[in-house]
Swiss-Prot record:
Residues 257-269 have a biased composition (Low complexity). One of its GO terms (biological process) is positive regulation of transcription by RNA polymerase II. Residues 85-99, 258-303 form a coiled coil. This is Transcriptional coactivator YAP1. Phosphorylated by LATS1 and LATS2; leading to cytoplasmic translocation and inactivation. The gene is YAP1.
Length: 448
């Protein structure tokens, strides 16, 4: 409804009499004095109860649209004027952007362009990314080989050139190095009477890199670095070395060839040296194996004359000995002495006999029949069987064939005899021995 139309009036209720001051209908245009509704006379108060006038505001939509227009079209809107930024007394650094290389991280140029050293951040000398590519000393050993400053490939990352100049390097004339209470270094220039965080020795190194191709000391340094690397390679692998990696040129020792070819040559030499080391190691192992086999006693000469033992307790022990005979470290000389054990299953009971000699049983009282026998009473290395074992009845074992450094017994000569039936003589002897034993400990058998 437009504001120009007459405002509707609420009809009076029937229960109430008409008020003496009743608002009369307004003509068109009478209520246009105020944008929000009809104009009231200065002395007129609020309408009485039951005669309120309903105002329909039509300008709210236009005001909201004006707000959007002011935002979307700032030039056409009435924006209040503010003080310009130039007139606000701000420092000059507020309007000047920082230099591109002033920050330590922005100084890392992956393209490899090395510019002049510029004043950098306070902590820039300890940041690996802040060092220029040309700030490394000539002849630096890199993973791709020995390279010089100007001849370095542009694809090298700057972290390979990060370094910290030690304190023993002399300063230029007129310079002095001091440290803050926190331990940070700064440099004093007595000539200009200035103080800086930048190390003046870095500028000297950059100047040396510029004159590297025509400087004889730099060429000598490069040759020394190359010889040092070849010496380290020769110490790690004492094999015949190929020619030097980078032949020096008369102009200053600039490395020839591209970076990829150098890396391929280095990799090829490493593979050749590794192959040579493996071949030498294999030959050394073969020589050790032959030396160990020469120490083992051979049973081929005595194999046809011996008669192996076939007793009930021999099966498992002979299987163990046959397995161990293939290991040169267990049965070679004095490496393994199983004849020292007297209280375990690996004692001399491996060659069990059917009965104990009578002369040995007479000396039982004089021996310690406990579970553990001190090894100090036993010879440290028994290379022969006791003499009383030669007089044992019921066996035809040639004890001379069982003597040796490791008492090696070949499995091919023993395994067929393990399947033979036990003789009746051995069983009778075992029954007689078991029947003669008493339960008391004094007369209990002591097994060897």
């Amino acid at each position: 409804m437009d504001p120009g139309q007459p405002q509707p009036q609420q009809p009076p209720q029937a229960a109430q009499p008409p008020a003496p001051q009743q608002a009369a209908p307004q003509p068109p245009g009478a209520g246009s004095g105020a944008p929000g509704g009809a104009a009231q006379p200065p002395g007129a108060g609020p309408p009485p109860a039951g005669h309120q006038i309903v105002h329909v505001r039509g300008d709210s939509e236009t005001d909201l649209e004006a707000l959007f227009n002011a935002v979307m079209n700032p030039k056409g809107a009435n924006v209040p004027h503010t003080l310009p930024m130039r007139l606000r007394k701000l420092p000059d650094s507020f309007f000047k952007p920082p230099e591109p290389k002033a920050h330590s991280r922005q100084a890392s140029t992956d393209a490899g362009t090395a510019g002049a050293l510029t004043p950098q951040h306070v902590r820039a000398h300890s940041s690996p990314a802040s060092l220029q590519l040309g700030a490394v000393s000539p002849g630096t050993l890199t993973p791709s080989g020995v390279v010089t400053g100007p001849g370095a490939p542009s694809s090298q990352h700057l972290r390979q050139s990060s370094f910290e100049i030690p304190d023993d390097v002399p300063l230029p004339p007129g310079w002095e190095m001091a440290k803050t209470p926190s331990g940070q270094r700064y440099f004093l220039n007595h000539i200009d009477q200035t103080t800086t965080w930048q190390d003046p020795r870095k500028a000297m190194l950059s100047q040396m890199n510029v004159t590297a191709p025509t400087s004889p000391p730099v060429q000598q340094n490069l040759m020394n670095s190359a010889s040092a690397m070849n010496q380290r390679i020769s110490q790690s692998a004492p094999v015949k070395q190929p020619p030097p990696l980078a032949p020096q040129s008369p102009q200053g020792g600039v490395m020839g060839g591209s970076s990829s070819n150098q890396q391929q040559q280095m990799r090829l030499q490493q593979l050749q040296m590794e192959k040579e080391r493996l071949r030498l190691k294999h030959q050394e192992l073969l020589r050790q194996e032959l030396a160990l086999r020469s120490q083992l006693p051979t049973m081929e000469q005595d194999g046809g004359s011996q008669n192996p033992v076939s007793s009930p307790g021999m099966s498992q022990e002979l299987r163990t000995m046959t397995t161990n005979s293939s290991d040169p470290f267990l049965n070679s000389g004095t490496y393994h002495s199983r004849d020292e054990s007297t209280d375990s299953g690996l004692s001399m009971s491996s060659y069990s006999v059917p009965r104990t000699p009578d002369d040995f049983l007479n000396s039982v009282d004089e021996m310690d029949t406990g579970d553990s026998i001190s090894q100090s009473n036993i010879p440290s290395h028994q290379n022969r069987f006791p003499d009383y074992l030669e007089a044992i009845p019921g066996t035809n074992v040639d004890l001379g064939t069982l003597e040796g450094d490791g008492m090696n017994i070949e499995g091919e000569e023993l395994m067929p005899s393990l399947q033979e039936a036990l003789s009746s003589d051995i069983l009778n002897d075992m029954e007689s021995v078991l029947a003669a034993t008493k339960p008391d400990k004094e007369s209990f058998l002591t097994w060897l």
